[in-house]
């Protein structure tokens, strides 16, 4: 993703990168070479929307399989191109991981023709800490946190839309975190959800409450479930309401696509359904 020797924003003082590892259950640690894994739809659509997925893990690790690959495979089956991020973690300053996301958005746009995705329909999605990272990406509104390094950075780093699943760190002691406050003024479409049994519920609820108090409310769709603890992801429990949130997400994506004449409605028809008994 970054040209050799040109990756911006180095390690924090007295930190070492270590070696990247992935456990048998898909927990990734020690990311020092950021990048993303590509999951392209196979349904023959001329173009598709694209979602850059930021797994959570409290910035100490990445729940890469459950909140990354599993979500990507689900979107892929439904005709949406998905890209799972490996971003730099707490050994690096916060701007490092934000730079990784911005670079990824520009990289995907620069390869939109190759991957058959619409450059105007490339969004970001995050779980937990990854949701905070996605929200920070919205807040900076495409303004890069690093100096452009090549022609890839001529492409926009602004997400077309953003989704946050049980996002964390939007608030701090009851106040909106400075890192996301500017997102109240965005024109980016947003989708958020959380379970009200989640210890981090105040993050999503607090941000949504702030949106409702704005003179010009952002375009945000929010869903709150009376059940659901932190970390439910795309689940194998299809009969529990909180585990069917992905239907709502796909309906929202389809609505965005249908409002833009540059994407044919026929090409987005697959976004209207998820197979019954979906288990990934």
Predicted regions and their residues:
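Short beta-strand element of the alpha/beta-hydrolase
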Residues: 47-56
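C-terminal catalytic histidine-bearing segment of alpha/beta-hydrolase fold enzymes
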Residues: 208, 214-280
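Catalytic nucleophile-loop/oxyanion-hole region of alpha/beta-hydrolase
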Residues: 63-65, 85-119, 237-242
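Primarily recognizes the serine-hydrolase "nucleophile elbow" in alpha/beta-hydrolase
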Residues: 99, 103-185
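Conserved alpha/beta-hydrolase "acid-adjacent" motif
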Residues: 199-206
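N-terminal cap/lid segment of alpha/beta-hydrolase-fold proteins
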Residues: 1-45
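Short beta-strand/loop motif that positions the catalytic acidic residue
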Residues: 191-194
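Short amphipathic alpha-helix adjacent to the substrate-entry channel of hydrolases
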Residues: 64-83
